[in-house]
Amino acid sequence: MTIDRTYPIFTVRWLAVHGLAVPTVFFLGAISAMQFIQR
């Protein structure tokens, strides 16, 4: 039953990485777009 114990950890880690990476990329894209529009 080691697979059942490591699976949730991998899922939580995957969700945490994507949950932080997606908004960060979107936020950086919005900032770069704002600065590009201001110029």
Curated annotation (Swiss-Prot):
SUPFAM superfamilies from the UniProt entry: Cytochrome b559 subunits
What are the protein's UniProt keywords? Answer: Chloroplast, Electron transport, Heme, Iron, Membrane, Metal-binding, Photosynthesis, Photosystem II, Plastid, Thylakoid, Transmembrane, Transmembrane helix, Transport
What family does the database annotate? Belongs to the PsbE/PsbF family.
Q: Name one Pfam family in it.
A: Cytochrom_B559
**Cofactor(s) needed for function:** heme b
Q: Which BP terms in the Gene Ontology apply to this protein? A: photosynthetic electron transport chain
What is the name of this protein? Cytochrome b559 subunit beta
Q: What is its main location?
A: plastid
Indicate how the chain sits in the lipid bilayer.
Single-pass membrane protein
Gene name on record? psbF
